[in-house]
Regions:
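Carboxylate- and glycine-rich phosphate/diphosphate-binding segment that chelates Mg2+/Mn2+
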Residues: 16-130
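Amphipathic alpha-helical interaction segments
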Residues: 84-88, 92, 115-118, 137-140, ...
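Proline/glycine-rich low-complexity loops and linkers
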Residues: 1-19
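Acidic, glycine-rich active-site loops and adjacent beta-strand->loop/helix elements
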Residues: 8-12, 49, 159-162
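Glycine-rich phosphate/pyrophosphate-binding beta-alpha loops
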Residues: 11, 121-154
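Gly/Pro-rich interdomain helix-loop hinge
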Residues: 145-201
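Short beta-alpha connecting loops at secondary-structure transitions
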Residues: 51, 140-141, 185
Length: 201
């Protein structure tokens, strides 16, 4: 059947990825399932579909999207094409997430939703080709065991994951800092990687 997918949140990029999760509360775990036929024929990332999200959901889903982009960029399988997607996603999400949360709290129309919609979309295009990392591996267990929203679990673990990966991914984390708008001129690689971690904090 011909399918059209229109997401109502800016996080999972399920409309452009081949994976999905199934939670098993009895086994206290989530199973990652992959099925190419789950990709819809048409995907429409319409920011107007996301304007009703409350501030908490906006923050949680936005941090999931940022985690996708950062983990995808620092993944072992990362390559030139996925790098372009991930760096642009980091830039868009970093520019728009705080504004979107602030506007959601105020109950105002949100000009940042378009950037969030595009950022999560292209992050999904990137990570579906290279995979994710330790943050998501831990977040799946945390969210299942403690009934924590997935985006909140990802946000709680992102700094830990970045610190853990820094010894082997400092250069890539330095690139993340630049994509987040940090002025890294004059910094060495390790300092710039630390600046990325601080920017996420």
């Amino acid at each position: 059947a011909f399918t059209i997918a229109v997401p109502a949140t800016a996080d999972t990029a399920a409309e452009v990825t081949i994976g999905y999760l199934v939670a098993d509360p009895d086994k206290v775990r989530k199973f990652v399932c992959v099925e190419v036929s789950d990709i819809p024929d048409v995907a429409i990332a319409d920011p107007d579909m996301m304007v009703s999200m409350p501030a908490g959901l906006t923050a949680a889903t936005g941090m999931d999207a940022l985690t996708h982009a950062i983990e995808g960029y620092t993944a072992k399988g990362a390559w030139e094409l996925s790098d372009m997607f991930h760096l642009k996603a980091i830039e868009l999400i970093s520019k728009n997430l705080r504004h979107s949360v602030k506007e959601a709290k105020a109950g105002k129309p949100d000009s940042g939703r378009e950037g969030m919609a595009l950022g999560q979309y292209i992050a999904g295009m990137g990570f579906s080709n290279v995979g994710l990392g330790i943050d998501h591996a831990m977040a799946h267990t945390l969210s299942t065991r403690y009934d924590t929203p997935h985006g909140v679990a990802c946000a709680m673990l992102l700094l830990i994951a970045m610190e853990f990966n820094k010894p082997v991914a400092a250069k890539r984390l330095a690139d993340v800092a630049v994509a987040m708008g940090v002025d890294t001129e004059g910094m060495d690689t390790e300092s710039a990687a630390d600046a990325a971690i601080e920017a996420v904090r």
